[in-house]
Amino acid sequence: RRAPPDAARAFVAACALSAAGTSSPPRGDRLDRLTDQLRGAAPMVATLAGARVEADGETLAWRREPGEFRRGQSPVLRLAPGETGVWDGRFEITANQALEIAPLVGRTASLAEPSARALRQVAAPARGALPALETADGLVCPLLQPTPGVTMRALALARLQAACGLVVREP
């Protein structure tokens, strides 16, 4: 809240970019308005460039806005056995078998029980933007339920650190 205006604006843009998994940072009046709103203590919810931000004076949460999937084309990642790919700019996924990852939005009722149970612990606005895939056990979210042959790594924090100049050398 006390950061210089240009630094605050750059940080808000980096947060939106990282949470949404996009490659072009937001600019313009919407970014300026959101930056100004976040300097205040009033509770607020806003979206910017595919990201959803919620603030209540105490906490600040950045998430992917799942409504973007309904408005545009949903990201689908198809992997061959042994292949690694990045889904929605937010998760690196490696698979031992062929699979297809797509957003959970609109499909939560179809989740296999272990994923459905774990999903209840996830903030409602974040649920639809989670990755999901079909397995022999049904629809699962590898972030919520161990999924044999699938490894997943979240990229948002690393992207934010890089956007803020905190990465000295990439691995």
Protein language model regions, located:
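AMP-forming adenylation/ATP pyrophosphatase catalytic core
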Residues: 1-171
